[in-house]
UniProtKB/Swiss-Prot annotation:
This is tRNA uridine 5-carboxymethylaminomethyl modification enzyme MnmG. The keyword Nucleotide-binding does not apply. GO terms for biological process: tRNA methylation; tRNA wobble uridine modification. The keyword NAD applies. Its cofactor is FAD. One of its GO terms (molecular function) is flavin adenine dinucleotide binding. Keywords: Cytoplasm, FAD, Flavoprotein, NAD, tRNA processing. One of its GO terms (cellular component) is cytosol. NCBIfam families: mnmG_gidA. It comes from the Bacteria. NAD(+) binds at residues 275-289. FAD binds at residues 15-20. NAD-binding protein involved in the addition of a carboxymethylaminomethyl (cmnm) group at the wobble position (U34) of certain tRNAs, forming tRNA-cmnm(5)s(2)U34.
Length: 631
């Protein structure tokens, strides 16, 4: 292969974190020639902050990434050293999987996936510049001055754009601890007609486990049997399982923190970027919740072959001497040795309202953004965006139409729609409460929602497709069996069934009717003589129970979605000057001109846009012949 051909690609992905790896893998799965540029091959898939995958809302994203053929769930299964199902006592919509991960095992799993993926090349070089011609990106320039050309480029640069690390009143440039920032690229992007702001995030000090007294802490074991993250995974993938621990801050801790606030970069005005609301620093907690006597700390191992632990809950940028005193004031940490100081990092992000649903920028064709550059926080949010951006970069390189999930299809759709419609002024984190259709967007049915779409797009391989079809066939056959299998009230096995129910069976009843009763679970029904044997596949069995038990609620939500779909499919002209529409208030005009929503549905979700304003908008555009339906 000539040197010239080696330097031309269909898709270039800049950055090898959680967004970049999913983007590069997605593009390569579509069969296009893909280059992943990373400043350091050894940090591919690195967990820069907490050593965990999943959680409320986040676990849903991981399942969706997996349903579309992504790598995050598989890597979590291979690296997970403690698995738990959160909200296990609540309804299926809000149940979520979380895995404590071994950092090194996770990186190994990601790197192996990248290095064995056909159509994907990896090159170690930072990116300093974009090649832009006639408002279209055509390539990148590396630190060495090497030029790589491409049809599309995906930027997944994390916290590296103009990164500034703060510990107390001291600060220095960095993309994260130990890594240089991407200042040249940040300067280049600031020269583009895109809105840019600053955000900040932080991380706690790391502690040597042999200096910690775990005996005075509350042990937090994982679930047994352990949940499995990937639809293609199994418990045999899991390494050794170990516990986490819980301890708490106290009034002495809080007084130490308060005494150091005058040297805090957050409270002395040094940091201007807004931090994550749902993962605040310990100094933020003490100030905002001054009446609270203690705060919970999850003491999490960083891996099986390291002595470092991650004290989840005391993220801080206080001076190091204050960090030492606050850590040693905590029960079990009295003799704690800090191996790495906590710090805050400030970085550039770009207003995601300047993005299309495909995550392509509106002003530079072929340029896609994913991850923290869009104002999000979290590995899972980054991975979800990366997959969609990489997919659409590859589709555009093949001259195909873009695809992005709708709000009623996936949490990915909620994430992208929230960002591109509403923007964000603080690091955006996913929660189940953000999804209005969460009864349909469950962890258990992510494959049912997305795998067929992924197959049609080219994201899903033969093995996953075969496994999915086998599961779906089992679910449908078992639902039909329960619907058509009736037990008479005088049958010998009714005694077993009556032991499961609150009110005894008084007439002939089907398995489906029994399973609709809230107190009966599929696994118990399948153990009775009459309805045995049940399904061996626990995922298929879970699906049967949920589909039957919640059928009425699911149908109602599907009807609601059908009503809303009319607005979601009605496209708005872009760009458009909404001042031309008589009757709209100045506030509505300003917001519509600022957001430039792609559809009527997106316009209706902008804060301050009333139903009356939407009606006026529709009437005017219809008269002008400017309304059209999406394909």
């Amino acid at each position: 292969m000539s040197q010239q051909s080696q330097q031309h690609f269909d898709v270039i992905v800049v950055g090898g974190g959680h967004a970049g790896t999913e983007a590069a893998l997605a593009a390569a799965r579509l069969g296009v020639k893909t280059l992943l540029l990373t400043h350091n091959i050894d940090t591919l898939g690195q967990m820069s902050c907490n050593p965990a995958i999943g959680g409320i809302g986040k676990g849903h994203l991981v399942k969706e990434i997996d349903a579309l053929g992504g790598v995050m769930a598989k890597a979590a299964d291979k690296a997970g050293i403690q698995f738990r199902t959160l909200n296990s006592s609540k309804g299926p919509a809000v149940r979520a999987t979380r895995a404590q991960a071994d950092r090194q095992l996770y990186k190994q799993a990601i790197r192996y996936a990248l290095e064995t993926q056909p159509n994907l090349s990896i090159f170690q070089q930072g990116c300093d510049d974009l090649i832009v011609e006639n408002d279209r990106v055509t390539g990148v320039v590396t630190q060495m001055g090497l030029k790589f050309t491409a049809k599309t480029v995906v930027l997944t640069v994390g916290t590296f754009l103009g990164g500034q690390i703060h510990i107390g009143l001291d600060n220095y440039q960095g993309g994260r601890a130990g890594d240089p920032p991407s200042n040249a690229l940040a300067k280049r992007l600031r020269a583009l007609p895109l809105r840019v702001e600053r955000l900040k995030t932080g991380t706690p000090p790391r502690i040597a486990s042999h200096s910690v007294d775990f005996s005075v802490m509350q042990e937090q074991p994982g679930d047994n049997p352990t949940p499995v993250f990937s639809y293609m995974g199994s418990r045999s993938d899991h390494p050794q399982q170990i516990p986490c621990y819980i301890t708490h801050t106290n009034e002495n801790t809080h007084e130490i923190i308060r005494s150091g606030l005058d040297r805090s970069p957050m409270y002395s005005g040094v940091i201007e970027g807004v931090g994550p609301r749902y993962c605040p620093s310990i100094e933020d907690k003490i100030v905002r919740f001054a009446d609270k006597g203690s705060h919970q700390i999850f003491v999490e191992p960083e891996g099986l072959n390291t002595f470092e632990i991650y004290p989840n809950g005391i993220s801080t940028s206080l001076p190091f001497d204050v960090q030492q005193r606050l850590v040693q004031s905590i029960k079990g940490f009295e003799n704690a040795h800090i191996t790495r100081p906590g710090y805050a990092i400030e970085y550039d992000y770009f207003d995601p309202r300047d993005l299309k649903q495909s995550l392509e920028t509106k002003v530079i064709n072929g340029l896609f953004f994913a991850g923290q550059i869009n104002g999000t926080t979290g590995y899972e949010e980054a991975g979800a965006q990366g997959l969609i951006a990489g997919l659409n970069a590859a589709l555009q390189a093949q001259d195909k139409e873009s695809w992005a999930p709708r709000r009623d299809q996936a949490y990915m759709g909620v994430l992208i729609d929230d960002l591109s419609t509403l923007g964000t002024q603080e690091p955006y984190r996913m929660f189940t409460s953000r999804a209005e259709y969460r009864l349909l967007l469950r962890e258990d049915n992510a494959d049912m929602r997305l795998t067929e779409i992924g197959r049609n797009l080219g994201l899903v391989d033969d093995e996953r497709w075969a496994a999915f079809n086998k599961k779906m066939e089992s679910v449908e056959q078992e639902k039909q069996r329960l619907k058509t299998t009736w037990v008479h009230k005088d049958h010998a096995s009714v005694e077993q069934i009556n032991a499961l129910v609150k009110s005894p069976v008084t007439k002939e009843v089907s398995g489906e009717e029994l399973l609709r009763r809230p107190e009966i679970h599929y696994k118990d029904l399948a153990l009775t003589d009459f309805f045995a044997p049940g399904l061996e596949d626990p995922l298929a069995a879970e699906q049967v129970e949920i589909q039957i038990k919640y059928a009425g609620y699911i149908t109602r939500q599907q009807e609601e979605i059908a009503k809303q779909q009319r607005h979601e499919n009605t496209l708005l002209p872009s760009p458009f000057d909404y001042a031309k529409i008589k009757g709209l208030s100045n506030e509505v005009v300003a917001k519509l001109n600022d957001h430039q929503p792609e559809t009527v549905g997106k316009a209706a979700r902008i804060s301050g846009i009333t139903p009356a304003a939407v009606s006026m908008l529709l009437v005017h555009l219809k008269k002008q012949g400017l309304l059209r339906k999406s394909a």
